[in-house]
Amino acid sequence: MSILASIQRQVTPIHPEGYPFIGGFAVATLVLSWLWSPLGWLGLMATLWCAYFFRDPARLTPLDESIVISPADGIVSSVGYHMPPPELGLGAEPMQRISVFMSVFDCHVNRAPVTGRVTKIVYRPGLFLNADLDKASMDNERNGLVIENNNGRFGVVQIAGLVARRIVCFAEKGDHLTTGERFGLIRFGSRLDVYMPEGVRPLVGVGAKAVAGETILADRQTDKPRPAFRYG
């Protein structure tokens, strides 16, 4: 392995969505430094924080079709049965839902919780309430995906929050996503909801720490061999 490749493996990459923001903070830092050097230090701290926010670390993802992986870094804020957003067309009955709240200090790159085909993507404008509130699922700006596989249909909803005002979704209808694959990003604090079909059993509780692409949120099977993993 070359020295450059070794360094690249040690340094956490920055997601391209963050480049304009980091560049803006860097320019502001130069201007502030020219005006008054102490302000330049504040600008430098803000620039470093922005780079930290848009970090995009590689993850070790379990490869098992029966499990559901966390789509986001953060804290599990809700586990239970809730009505899915009507625009997703997932039916008129409550579904098992697990919500992960992301603070401004969490990595905000979103990853697919399951492998499957994206059959629907629907954006809905809305409010910008605290994303940790239960009513934020229906009242806030959101972007929902339906992912279908042999286990059924899963709803994945990106929800904007008080600070987050920009939902980014890289996936398109018809795409085939693999578990842990990057599909979106929400800027500056938000939440991800995962709606699961019957037979999928939650394995986490409220307050649990979740890591996108790694933490197993739920499982369809109880007795099975240890899954393989993918790093990326």
UniProtKB/Swiss-Prot annotation:
User: What is the protein's quaternary organization?
Assistant: Heterodimer of a large membrane-associated beta subunit and a small pyruvoyl-containing alpha subunit.
Q: Kindly report, in one word, the top-level EC class recorded for this enzyme.
A: lyase
What's this protein's family per the entry? Answer: Belongs to the phosphatidylserine decarboxylase family. PSD-A subfamily.
Biological function? Catalyzes the formation of phosphatidylethanolamine (PtdEtn) from phosphatidylserine (PtdSer).
Protein name in UniProt = Phosphatidylserine decarboxylase proenzyme
Could you name the domain of life of the organism this protein comes from?
Answer: Bacteria
Q: Name one GO molecular function term.
A: phosphatidylserine decarboxylase activity
Q: What gene name is listed for this protein?
A: psd
